[in-house]
Design a protein with these regions (language model features):
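Conserved core segment of the aminotransferase class I/II
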Residues: 72-144, 148-152, 157-159
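Short beta-strand
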Residues: 160-165
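Catalytic cores of transferase enzymes with a strong primary signal for eukaryotic protein kinases
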Residues: 55, 62, 142, 146-150, ...
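Short, well-ordered beta-to-alpha junction loops that form the rim of enzyme active sites
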Residues: 15, 52-53, 166-167
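Short SAM/SAH-binding signature in class I
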Residues: 8-10
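Active-site pre-lysine segment of PLP-dependent enzymes
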Residues: 2-6, 18-89, 98, 104
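Conserved PLP-binding active-site segment of the aspartate aminotransferase-like
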Residues: 168-174
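Short, histidine-centered active-site or binding-site loop motifs used for metal coordination
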Residues: 13-16, 114, 134, 174
């Protein structure tokens, strides 16, 4: 209902900050169907921007589905600062799904936006280090251990809490 004729993109975050919700394949399929339907109705594609800095922090062995696998007009944003435990480092990428309408223009436009808004390249040493760590992750199990401890304590105190499926956030009902 909130997607109107002027809607050009929808932004999602999975696993979600601050709730820790991980969107299921079923949810992403339904979202893709709605975006496809609305795109046809309005005569223009609606892009899906998927913000995925917490992709590698999922609990209970849960696999986080790739939203780009469900919808062709997806831009994926990723940050290494979470998966490699590099707090404060702003190093990541934006990927345009191959075949996405206007993919060449989008890539050029993102490069220009990055320059105009003052985003600078991270230090060379960080770029080189991350380049060599593509198949490596930090021990992220500490986040699940901490989440379980905090979840158990909060619920024992009577707080209503949705058990997070990922991230290092927990969102008690106020």
């Amino acid at each position: 209902q909130m997607i109107g004729e002027k809607t050009t993109c929808v932004l999602i975050n999975t696993p979600n900050n601050p709730t820790g919700v991980v969107y299921s394949a079923q949810t992403l399929t339904r979202m893709a169907d709605i975006l496809t339907e609305k795109s046809k109705a309005f005569g223009h594609n609606i892009f899906l921007v998927s913000d995925e800095p917490y992709r590698d922090i999922a609990f209970d062995g849960k696999k986080v589905p790739y939203p780009a696998a469900f919808y062709p007009h997806t831009l994926t944003c990723f940050s290494y600062s979470k998966s490699l435990s590099l707090p404060g480092e702003r190093l990541g990428y934006v990927a345009v799904r191959p075949g996405c309408e206007g993919e060449d223009i989008l890539v050029d436009m993102m490069a220009q936006i990055s320059r105009f808004t003052g985003h600078n390249c991270p230090p060379s040493i960080i770029q080189r280090a991350v380049g060599r760590c593509q198949e490596v992750t930090s021990d992220l199990s500490v986040y699940e251990t901490n989440m379980n401890l905090l979840y158990d304590k909060l619920t024992a105190l009577g707080f209503e809490v949705e058990r997070p499926g990922g991230t290092f956030y927990i969102f008690p009902k106020a």
